[in-house]
Amino acid sequence: MPGTASLLDAMHAFATGRADAVVGFAQQPIEMRARKIGQVIVNTTTDRPWSQYFCCMLGANREFVQRYPVTTKRALRAILKAADLCDSEPLKVARFLSDKLYEPRYQVGAEVVKSLPYNRWREANPEDTIRFHALRLHEVGMIKSTPQKLIAQGTDWRFLNELKKELKA
């Protein structure tokens, strides 16, 4: 919403009737539900077609990856191990988030961590996500490249595929 500086401002604008809707990340819908404000229209974690694709992906500069492949793989490994920890021990992760004040409200953090599909990286194909979003962007004229061209020229799944084998559950 124009004139809002933060998600809190956007939520306040919605709660006071100055906005008809608000886009929230994981915490905001939980907070608004607790305050009995509005209702969720689309939940990309559970509603199709969005729920079938990754909400977040890791991007890297091609030159950096070529110059520092070991560092790149280590960073990706750390992120995937963190995702596994979120999946296997959500309450421990929520406590960490609360202790470090990343999400100071333990209950909100716990609900968020438990609600997100952190283990999806093991089974889902990230290429499907790129294809899905590229098709939408291509359809509305925001990108000129085809999904196939974007995937061919802009993705490299080697590290991910290697780590899927290395980090078997």
Specify the residue positions occupied by each region the protein language model found.
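Conserved C-terminal helix/tail region of periplasmic/extracytoplasmic solute-binding proteins
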Residues: 138-169
